[in-house]
Amino acid sequence: MQELEKAVPSSVRVTRQSENLVILEKDLATEQMVLAMGPQHPSTHGVLKLECLTDGEVVTEAEPVLGYLHRCFEKTAENVDYPAVVPFTDRLDYLAAMNSEFAYALTVEKLLDIEIPRRVEFIRILVAELNRIASHLVAIGTYGIDLGAFTPFLFCFRDREIILGLLEWASGARMLYNYVWVGGLAYDVPADFLKRIREFCAYFRPKAKELADLLTSNEIFVKRTHGIGIMPADVAINYGWSGPMLRGSGVEWDLRRNDPYSLYSELDFNVCVPDGKHSVIGDCLSRHLVRAYEMEESLNIIEQCIDKMPSSDGFNSRAAIPKKIRPKAGEVYGRAENPRGELGFYIQSDGKSTKPLRCKARSSCFVNLSAMKDLSKGQLIPDLVAIIGSIDIVLGEVDR
């Protein structure tokens, strides 16, 4: 054995385990391997591909590969009239289409400098918050499936069906609504709609707490998310994060509160940020908790909208604007707090055409996903699933 050790080059470390077993460090070294995850992998929530560089089970680098769902949204928007862009915004974040319509309508109305009826504003906020709850239910339910918990998915989608039924009653569609138009709404809500919404709030309020506890009281779920994919607040800000992702890192930033649009300044609600008691601030569990507790705040906003909403007597669902819109020459940026963060639209008008000269969409999903390299570095391969699920991406908005 001693003769064998003498024959080993000095550059190779020798570890003596016993008289008969000598382990050379060179034999234990591993080579880095490229692992392709997706674009058909079920945990990527769409056609996302991750090219991962791994050292054994540890991820050293993960690079998102995008473009599989690119649909030329911006170029399409520049070739149709301003109001005709609304149905295309539905197909960005198709799980929160009402919020996408809202953001676009706000931007064009800012360019037109027009005033919207108060009843329209409250209805817009109401349906947007309903859609926010439905979106968070998808995020929570599918996150449970990603990590092996099937029961929460069933409960989440049971309650989401109720919301989709209410939105279908108001707009005529379950997911792609085309309801929030430039200047107002497609039409007023049905006669008993607000009564049904209030009944839903009373029903869902205890359910929201139950759904939040269903996963956070699950020991396996907590171990899979606690301390995984930590993003410090300063790094999150530098990346341009927003929404539950930024709030999950402990930053109390919500456009509805910090830069109010529509009538949010008249509404009272809390901005949900983790307190660090149940999670490491900035980890996957923190981001999940933000979404879970935001649903109750959305219920508070909805009930306030119903209380403050003016009567429908003599109500016109649209402001007095011409059928063909020709905004004055200029540019404008409008933004709104979508379920996944800030969705913004930059629109440029030449003052002559009925079509935007330039229409740029700022996607929160794209920005949040861009931090995948930092989030995944040093994590285990199975933890990539937990990290992707915590980002809650919609590839329709990422690729546009």
Curated annotation (Swiss-Prot):
Primary enzyme class: translocase
Catalytic activity: a quinone + NADH + 5 H(+)(in) = a quinol + NAD(+) + 4 H(+)(out)
UniProt-listed InterPro entries: NADH_Q_OxRdtase_suD, NDH1_su_D/H, NiFe-Hase_large
Subcellular location: Cell inner membrane
Binding partners and assembly: NDH-1 is composed of 14 different subunits. Subunits NuoB, C, D, E, F, and G constitute the peripheral sector of the complex.
The EC number(s) this enzyme carries: 7.1.1.-
Presence of the UniProt keyword Translocase in the record: yes
GO cellular component, one term: plasma membrane
Name under which the protein is recorded: NADH-quinone oxidoreductase subunit D
Protein species of origin: Chlorobium chlorochromatii (strain CaD3)
PANTHER family given in the database record: NADH DEHYDROGENASE [UBIQUINONE] IRON-SULFUR PROTEIN 2, MITOCHONDRIAL (PTHR11993:SF10), NADH-UBIQUINONE OXIDOREDUCTASE 49 KDA SUBUNIT (PTHR11993)
